[in-house]
Structure formats: C-alpha cells, structure tokens
Design a protein with these regions (language model features):
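Hydrophobic structural segments
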Residues: 1-29, 37
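Linker/hinge segments immediately adjacent to helix-turn-helix/homeobox DNA-binding domains
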Residues: 20, 27-43, 53, 57-60, ...
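Basic, amphipathic alpha-helical hairpins
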Residues: 30-34, 44-58, 77, 81, ...
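Short, leucine-enriched amphipathic alpha-helices that occur as contiguous helical runs
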Residues: 38-46, 90-94
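Basic/polar phosphate-binding segments, predominantly the helix-turn-helix DNA-binding elements
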Residues: 56-88, 112-137
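Terminal helix-turn-helix DNA-binding modules in bacterial transcription factors
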Residues: 79-118, 141-170
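Helix-turn-helix/homeodomain-like alpha-helical modules used for DNA recognition
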Residues: 121-131, 135-136, 152-187
Length: 187
C-alpha cells in the first residue's frame, strides 16, 4: 500500500513537472517579442488546460473550472476560427499520456487509470478514435517530445495569429454570473 501511494505521489509530482515542460514550449510557440505576445487570457487558458487535463475529459468540466458556460466557451472558440476547446483538452490529455508512457514501469492500465479513464478498454477506444492507433502503438510512435511537437504543429502554429488576439474569458453581460446586474428588456 505504501509503495502504491508513493507511486501515485510521484506521478502527481511528475505531472506538475510535465506541465512546466509543456508550457515552456507552448507559450513561446504562441508568439513573443517582437511579435505581439498572446493575450493574458490565452496564456491562462493554456495554463489551465495543462494543469487540469489529467483529471478532466469534458468541456463542461473545463468550463466549470474556468467559470464560463460551456456553450459560451465553445462559441468563442468557433467565432475566433480556432479548434474547439475539446480539441485542445483532448490533445493536452494525450500529451500527459505520452509523458506517463515514458515510464517503462507503468502499464497501459496504469496510465489509463491515472488519466482518469474508466478502464483500459475505454482508453484504448479513445486512442483509436482520435489517432487511429492502439495504446501500445501510441507509446512507441509518440514519445513525449514528438507528441508535444505535433500538438504545437497542429493546434498552435496554424492558429497563432487568432490565438494572440483571443480572449476566451472575456465575460459579457450575459455570463458574468449571479452577481451581474439584471438586463432589462424594453418592450
């Protein structure tokens, strides 16, 4: 039991270090000086996704943590012409998976459960649906650095300009929560 707890604690600490490695490459890929830097909100979105991805698998749960309605979040991404928040979340979960697979002592089942899948079979179905590969193939073909480069190449670089100007949390009068002033409708 003590060994199992030590492995879990090590994995949690490792995922924190992994988050730092992801952000160290992802944030500069969004753009830096002399180009306009990404909006603070865009940076915060990616920091939140990197932090929350191992435990969250739905946009609804992500939106709850970000204190934005899921439909509002998805609408903002669509209007900005960038991939959906689900795409960014699913990709980030795959990055964390690739990181865990670097540990030869972790089985596919271990990784599936640590990434909060209900079963190794569910995890395998997800990999096959998203990438068309088995968990074993994913482990061999997508080591962490390859997976991170692919994430940046597919989800950041083509949308760099839109992401720099993007404001995913820009709350309007409709989604500021229960403390917002009521909107009156003349009529």
């Amino acid at each position: 039991m003590r060994l199992a707890l030590a492995q879990i604690n090590t994995t949690v600490g490792d995922l924190d270090g992994n988050r730092a490695r992801i952000l160290a490459r992802l944030i500069p890929a969004l753009g830096a000086t002399p180009e306009p830097a990404p909006s603070e909100e865009t940076r915060l979105f990616f920091e939140a996704v990197a932090r929350l991805a191992p435990a969250l698998s739905t946009v609804r749960a992500l939106a709850r943590h970000l204190r934005v309605r899921p439909s509002t979040l998805m609408s903002r991404f669509h209007r900005a012409g960038i991939p959906s928040p689900k795409t960014y979340l699913a990709g980030m979960r795959l990055l964390h998976t690739a990181f865990l697979f670097q540990n030869p002592g972790l089985s596919v089942s271990d990784v599936a459960y640590r990434m909060d899948y209900s079963s190794p079979q569910s995890f395998g179905r997800h990999l096959r649906a998203v990438l068309g590969v088995t968990a074993g193939e994913f482990r061999r073909r997508f080591p962490f650095d390859v997976a991170l480069a692919r994430y940046i190449d597919l989800l950041i670089t083509p949308y760099r300009e839109a992401l720099r100007a993007f404001h995913p949390f820009n709350a309007g009068s409709w989604d500021q929560g229960p403390s917002a002033v009521a909107v009156s409708r003349a009529g």
